[in-house]
């Protein structure tokens, strides 16, 4: 009986002989690209694609074997693959996409990619032009949120993992708050784009424990309610940051903003030592340890630990799509979906196959294309059992049995 590796090679040959595939299927790359394709097929395998549970389990075993290749990998190498995958999983979504594009082959390589990004965004020479300062500052703070205080004992490992899982879920695009607004900018570099949904916000007003000198206290007392209302109505921004020139309508927001430049994080979690520049961020972070989910959807009962998570979830019920494409008018539920859609107009193809070099606008296109190299054909004809890599090819084939003209 042929070994699994031989079966894998035979499967590739079969795909290459299939007339459906074009000439790109004859290109073979390094092991990592094929390994990544097998990993994705294993992780995204659907139960509905098999006749029953026994077939599903058998198919999962086969896909897992193709991914981990125990016949050629040691136990340590297999463990490293699993740890690497989990590390990428706990990263915030947009940062995860950025790291995956670098195709790290180990956990250390993945960490190096994240650290390089942190360093580049923290260097003054890599900041955006003056009109983009506000967004670049937020990005810098976002990267700082990814740093976890190192502890020598294994006891601290689980809280940190839980914390990173939570932050990957609750961080999102920095929106208008307390008189400060960040304008949309479609010209941001890709390194900034990947982090644009990672700023942590809450419903409640920000509460600060700020040590203010006597001069500032006197100034606050002299500010009348009418002056504040006038500033809000006219959009006047009287409080200017001396570091980057960004202006704010409220002095309290300016003080908080200045922590981006100073790196001050006065609010520290007593559980894991993670520090934050905002008290509200600390309060929401604590829920990663307690498991508390106070924000519940009235429609379906689903609960969330962060208010912004509930806000985005509600759009599923209301049908709200606040992010609209300025070119064609198509609207989207999430800003990340809008960014991906806009590549259709710009022609940008950021998802590239490591096997043959072919590029795609969307990640879904790349995932489907990977089946060319792995030989995966998950769609089976119920009439003749012929297999296909695409659902559209299966539907086209089924017309042969129905007599319908293709």
UniProtKB/Swiss-Prot annotation:
Positions bearing the Glycyl lysine isopeptide (Lys-Gly) (interchain with G-Cter in SUMO2) cross-link: 14, 149, 191, 205, 215, 250, 358
Zinc finger regions, C2H2-type: 239-261, 267-289, 295-317, 323-345, 351-373, 379-401
Keywords of this entry: DNA-binding, Isopeptide bond, Metal-binding, Nucleus, Repeat, Transcription, Transcription regulation, Ubl conjugation, Zinc, Zinc-finger
A cellular-component GO term for this protein: nucleus
Tissue specificity statement from the Swiss-Prot or TrEMBL entry: Expressed at high levels in the lung, liver, and kidney, while weakly expressed in intestine, brain, muscle, cholecyst, heart, and pancreas.
Record carries keyword Methyltransferase: no
SUPFAM superfamilies, per database record: beta-beta-alpha zinc fingers, Retrovirus capsid dimerization domain-like
Gene Ontology BP annotations: regulation of transcription by RNA polymerase II
Compartment(s): Nucleus
Cross-referenced Pfam families: SCAN, zf-C2H2
Family the UniProt entry places it in: Belongs to the krueppel C2H2-type zinc-finger protein family.
Function: May function as a transcription factor. May be involved in the development of multiple embryonic organs.
Protein name, UniProt field: Zinc finger and SCAN domain-containing protein 31
Protein's organism: Homo sapiens (Human)
Top-level taxonomy: Eukaryota, Metazoa, Chordata, Craniata, Vertebrata
Gene expressing this chain: ZSCAN31
């Amino acid at each position: 009986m042929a070994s699994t590796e031989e079966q894998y090679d035979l499967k590739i040959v079969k795909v290459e002989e299939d007339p459906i595939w074009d000439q790109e299927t004859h290109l073979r790359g390094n092991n990592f690209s094929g390994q990544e394709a097998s990993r994705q097929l294993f992780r995204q395998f659907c139960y509905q694609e098999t006749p029953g549970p026994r077939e599903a389990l058998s198919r999962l075993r086969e896909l897992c074997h193709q991914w981990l290749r125990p016949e050629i990998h040691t136990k340590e190498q297999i463990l490293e693959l699993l740890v690497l995958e989990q590390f990428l999983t706990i990263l915030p979504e947009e940062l995860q996409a950025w790291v995956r594009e670098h195709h790290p082959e180990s956990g250390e390589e993945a960490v190096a990619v994240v650290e390089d990004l942190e360093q580049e965004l923290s260097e003054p020479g890599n900041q955006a032009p003056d009109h983009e300062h506000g967004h670049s500052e937020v990005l810098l703070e976002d990267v700082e949120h990814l740093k976890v205080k190192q502890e020598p004992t294994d006891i601290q490992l689980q809280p940190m993992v839980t914390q990173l899982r939570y932050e990957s879920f609750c961080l999102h695009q920095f929106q208008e708050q307390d008189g400060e607004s960040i304008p949309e900018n479609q010209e941001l570099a890709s390194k900034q784009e990947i982090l644009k949904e990672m700023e942590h916000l809450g419903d409640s007003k920000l509460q600060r424990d700020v040590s203010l000198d006597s001069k500032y206290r006197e100034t606050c007392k002299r500010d009348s309610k009418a002056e504040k209302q006038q500033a809000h109505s006219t959009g006047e921004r009287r409080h200017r940051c001396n570091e980057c020139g960004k202006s704010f309508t409220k002095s309290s927001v300016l003080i908080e903003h200045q922590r981006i430049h100073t790196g001050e994080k006065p609010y520290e979690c007593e559980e894991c030592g993670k520090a934050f520049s905002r008290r509200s961020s600390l309060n929401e972070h604590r829920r990663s340890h307690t498991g508390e989910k106070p924000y519940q959807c009235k429609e379906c009962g689903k609960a969330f630990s962060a208010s912004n998570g509930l806000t985005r979830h509600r759009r599923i019920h209301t049908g709200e799509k606040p992010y609209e494409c300025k070119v064609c008018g198509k609207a989207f539920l999430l800003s990340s979906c809008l960014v991906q859609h806009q590549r259709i107009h710009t022609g940008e193809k950021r998802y590239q196959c490591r096997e043959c070099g072919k590029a795609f606008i969307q990640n879904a296109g790349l995932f489907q294309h990977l089946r060319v190299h792995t030989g995966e054909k998950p769609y089976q004809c119920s009439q003749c059992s012929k297999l296909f890599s695409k659902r559209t090819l299966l539907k086209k084939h089924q017309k042969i049995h129905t007599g319908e003209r293709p």
